[in-house]
From Swiss-Prot:
Keywords in alphabetical order: ATP-binding, Ligase, Nucleotide-binding, Protein biosynthesis
Reactions that this protein is recorded to catalyse: L-glutamyl-tRNA(Gln) + L-glutamine + ATP + H2O = L-glutaminyl-tRNA(Gln) + L-glutamate + ADP + phosphate + H(+); L-aspartyl-tRNA(Asn) + L-glutamine + ATP + H2O = L-asparaginyl-tRNA(Asn) + L-glutamate + ADP + phosphate + 2 H(+)
Main EC class the enzyme belongs to: ligase
PANTHER family membership: GLUTAMYL-TRNA GLN AMIDOTRANSFERASE SUBUNIT B MITOCHONDRIAL AND PROKARYOTIC PET112-RELATED, GLUTAMYL-TRNA(GLN) AMIDOTRANSFERASE SUBUNIT B, MITOCHONDRIAL
GO MF, any single term: asparaginyl-tRNA synthase (glutamine-hydrolyzing) activity
Superkingdom of origin: Bacteria
EC nos: 6.3.5.-
Protein function: Allows the formation of correctly charged Asn-tRNA(Asn) or Gln-tRNA(Gln) through the transamidation of misacylated Asp-tRNA(Asn) or Glu-tRNA(Gln) in organisms which lack either or both of asparaginyl-tRNA or glutaminyl-tRNA synthetases. The reaction takes place in the presence of glutamine and ATP through an activated phospho-Asp-tRNA(Asn) or phospho-Glu-tRNA(Gln).
Example of a GO biological process term: translation
Quaternary structure annotation from Swiss-Prot or TrEMBL: Heterotrimer of A, B and C subunits.
Protein name (Swiss-Prot/TrEMBL): Aspartyl/glutamyl-tRNA(Asn/Gln) amidotransferase subunit B
InterPro entries, alphabetized: Asn/Gln-tRNA_amidoTrfase_suB/E (IPR017959), Asn/Gln-tRNA_Trfase_suB/E_cat (IPR006075), Asn/Gln_amidotransferase (IPR018027), Asn/Gln_tRNA_amidoTrase-B-like (IPR003789), GatB (IPR004413), GatB_C_1 (IPR042114), GatB_Yqey_C_2 (IPR023168), Gln-tRNA_amidoTrfase_suB_CS (IPR017958)
Species for this entry: Symbiobacterium thermophilum (strain DSM 24528 / JCM 14929 / IAM 14863 / T)
């Protein structure tokens, strides 16, 4: 099966729950992890006579997301009913937006591994309400003996971000989702946690002959619950479509469910079109009017976004593109870095970045910590850097101190005192050690006499061992050279 003569065309529909305090149509708490069916009311349950009242904060968050994603904002929009029947939707319809979404014509730029940049267009962002959550007694819907419904999620404000079919590979889809997640997290509209369902993604995919401008038959792929699952699902569907086409067949327009454990997709249902939902304007809500002044007020409240911050880290602090990208990848990492640089001074920015990327991230990976669980404060790191600058500890010992800070939560100065890690900078003490290691290693001494420069560094290493890494390395090299020259004159 050759993929060279085929082109994959991908569009994404990304659902993101907004982090408002309360739901979109009522005063119930918007809270993940509560006991089932505790954050509900007649509006959530669609009881007769219960009417929705718009939580305007959800509108603000939608506009904020749209501006962060370079969208135009619709000043006149409305809500519509999307009609379908499912157990988690007691009203029999979802309040959504059909022909007048709040945001439209946006884009996100992604940078691929080969350094090329691609612009992925965003067709629309509309505001809608989430449904409840089904809990199945079994591994999946088909095998479940019964299902339970938790309506805590019903009425949670949700935005749906729909891309144009601009993506061409699993790699591009993964990069887009990572970038989208970062932008939305920076803008403060959502915690975008896929593991908690606050960011969910459906994939629309088709395959066509390379060079063709016509779209192939589209498959919608659901139940892709992580970025890596999205990429695996796309790769599987791409191969499935190509296999059908090369065998002379034609893929069906259908909705399929991704089963990540088996690495396969299975048929859910034949694909519906928009007319199947019988959209019509929501009669219980007035049209939504947003003034130009309101849009500008929300724009002015946007924080510095990832692309702008990355550029600033490179221009103001001299960080490489890689280092800057790793730091801005998570909002918490960027805030941590900026606070540390503020404490240490701009001249220490590269040093802070090195410690953050090489040591802090290492420890966090080893311990399985997320960006909300940074185990060392900027104050602790800067305190340790000052001890290095003052000559109190060596760079090598600093790594030990850093690990101790992670383990104990103590500051560097306390750890150095308690562990006896102060740098040995006494010339007399170090010269005595240097003379001893030179005298007791005649073979290495002869190598040095023969012009092998690495022999001197070997002796420095022996001094570092004797002092448990506490010797000043520059002083150690100077005194090793002195001891070698003394030995050569004997």
């Amino acid at each position: 099966m050759s993929t060279a003569k085929w082109e994959t065309v991908i569009g994404l529909e990304v659902h993101v729950e907004l982090s408002t305090e309360t739901k979109i149509w009522c005063g119930c708490k918007n809270e993940f992890g509560a006991e089932p069916n505790t954050n509900v009311c007649p509006v959530c349950l669609a009881l007769p006579g219960a009417l929705p009242v718009l939580n305007y904060k959800a509108v603000e968050y939608t506009i904020r997301a749209g501006l962060a994603l370079n969208c135009k904002i619709q000043r006149h929009s409305k809500f519509d009913r999307k009609n379908y029947f499912y157990a988690d939707l007691p009203s029999g319809y979802q309040i959504s937006q059909f022909d007048l979404p709040l945001c439209y014509d946006g884009y996100v730029d992604i940078t691929k591994k080969d350094g090329t940049t691609r612009r992925i267009r965003i067709k629309r962002i509309h505001l809608e309400t989430d449904a409840g959550k089904l809990l199945h007694a079994g591994d999946d819907v088909a095998a479940a003996d019964y299902s339970l419904v938790d309506f805590n999620r019903a009425g949670v404000p949700l935005i749906e971000i729909v891309t144009e079919p601009d993506l061409r590979s699993a790699e591009e889809a993964g990069l887009f989702l990572q970038k989208l997640r970062t932008i939305l997290k920076y803008s403060g509209v959502s915690d975008v946690k896929m593991e908690e369902g606050s960011m969910r993604c459906d994939v629309n995919l088709s395959v066509r002959p390379a060079g063709s401008s016509e779209y192939g038959v589209r498959t919608e792929l659901k139940n892709v619950n992580s970025f890596s699952a999205v990429m695996r699902g796309i790769e599987y569907e791409e191969k499935r479509h190509i296999r059908i086409l090369e065998e002379g067949g034609q893929p069906e327009q259908e909705t399929r469910s991704w089963r990540d454990a088996q690495g396969i997709s299975v048929l859910l249902r034949s694909k519906e079109d928009a007319e199947d939902y019988r959209y019509f304007p929501e009669p219980d809500l007035p049209p939504l009017e947003v003034s130009a002044e309101e849009i500008e007020r929300i724009r002015a409240g946007l924080p510095e976004l990832p692309d702008a911050l990355m550029q600033r880290l490179m221009t103001e602090y001299g960080l490489s593109a890689y280092d800057a990208s790793v730091i801005v990848a998570e909002r918490e990492y960027a805030q941590w870095f900026l606070h540390a640089v503020e404490l240490a001074g701009a001249g220490q920015a590269k040093t802070v970045a090195n410690w953050q990327i090489n040591e802090l991230y290492r420890v966090m990976n080893e311990k399985g910590l997320g960006p909300e669980q940074i185990p060392v404060t900027p104050e602790q790191l800067v305190g340790m850097l000052k001890l290095i600058e003052q000559g109190t500890i060596t760079g090598k010992i600093a790594k030990t101190v850093f690990d101790k800070m992670v383990e104990t939560g103590k500051d560097a100065e306390t750890i150095v005192k308690e562990e006896g890690l102060t740098q040995v900078a006494d010339e007399g003490e170090l010269l005595a050690i240097a003379r001893e290691v030179v005298a007791s290693n005649p073979k290495v001494f002869e190598d040095w006499k023969a012009g092998k420069q690495s022999a001197a560094q070997w002796f420095v290493g022996q001094i570092m061992k004797r002092t448990r890494g506490r010797a000043n390395p520059q002083m150690a090299l100077k005194l090793v050279t002195q001891a070698l020259e003394e030995q050569a004159q004997k």
